[in-house]
Amino acid sequence: MTLAWELRKIGVPVTIHERKPSAGGSWWEPDLTKRDLHAHRILFDRGWVNTRSLLKDMDISWDALFERHTDGVFPYMFKKFKFQDYLALLTLPFVARRDRTLKDVLQGRMSPEGASIMEHLPLIIDGITWDVMSSYEMLESFNHVGLSRQWTQRVSGKVMGDLMYEALEKVGVEFKFNTSLDELLYISDEDNYVATFSDGTKLKDELLVLCVDHSPAIKLVGDNWGPGAKTMLNDTTYGCLNLLLDYPMGAPEMKDDLEIAATTPWKLQPRVLSDGKTLSCVICNLTDSILHTPPEALKQGVLEQLGVRAPETIRVGWGSTWDGERWQFHQSSGTLALTGQLPFFGRCSRVALCGMMSERRTPYASLEAAVEVGRQFAHENFGTPTPLETLKLSHIVILLLIVFVVLIIK
């Protein structure tokens, strides 16, 4: 939707084909009667400069959608960290690399308690554990959000999706809902393609931008981005299960989700939503055992590990379905690849890929990253303004060093 907004500002006609019945992306929720979300969210005000800018452009109030989140991971970290853990983290700027995982650079150098925290902290940041997250992503994530306050959703994701849809429709964006891209054939000798949608529409010649997450991208890239594209997407994609526990009289208070993730067998990430009645419990560490755990056993396991009273109902959030043997996922995301991201274009100049697999400055998968890559694509190919850049901790450090040097010289 970011890309559509940027292109309509310069008069480019845009049609969005959306497989869901309304707009919203991974923040989508089916209706306003009961919360049904793919995963709960954390936002960072000063770090999300492009998101705030886009919402302002669309005349959508940030405060109407989001509220301050007071819980934080630092109290639990400070309680558990030993002196050697702080020393290990101080070396991170010197050893962090894109091709080395966080586990590679920290394992064996921290106390057991400190290692456990750093193993599970990436789950809170980007839905992955330390053996998947690159040390670069961890360092840059702190750099990116270190000056920010945490926020979370005040209302259903449907509210934001509907407001963005209305803004886009006003400027002339055409939407085709309940429409999926069923087949994409690349015609290499013609530098063209044929795209077939579920409503029978066929496209060729026009610019087709695949604004998709990793799972559908795996099926759509073919060999257009080279032989390593599918491997990269497979290695960096991840999904989640979200169990929603309904407490009409008020959900129980929970400890910080980092502490619960570090102390439960399934690495659970629970959070009471803003309505105070819904406990959203995300499972990102999808082991083979969890993937083959039937719904009722999964619900019982979550209740036992959280140690909470029985809710009125337990539901599985949208995006995950049980096929009788295994959980299947219709929504996914992707972490930064250890080997680098994919370019917008492959061999075919008429088909582009724009999403979490694209090169981005925002290190963690998020709405901010999505807005950034949408703006970057529009800038590179249509001459629109570049994405905004976040004020980072490193910028402050550099500024202080410059001031220090100037004072010494004087």
Residue spans of the language-model regions?
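Dinucleotide-binding Rossmann-like beta1-alpha1 core, especially the glycine-rich loop
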Residues: 33-104, 108, 112
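Single-pass alpha-helical membrane anchors
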Residues: 164, 397-410
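A short, Lys/Arg-enriched amphipathic alpha-helix followed by its capping loop at the start of a domain
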Residues: 2-12, 170-171
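Active-site/ligand-binding neighborhood in enzyme catalytic cores
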Residues: 93-187
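Mid-domain catalytic core of redox enzymes
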Residues: 182-291, 401
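Conserved flavin/dinucleotide-binding core of flavoenzymes
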Residues: 263-399
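Glycine-rich FAD pyrophosphate-binding loop
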Residues: 8-30
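Residues forming the flavin
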Residues: 153-166, 179-186, 190-194, 198, ...
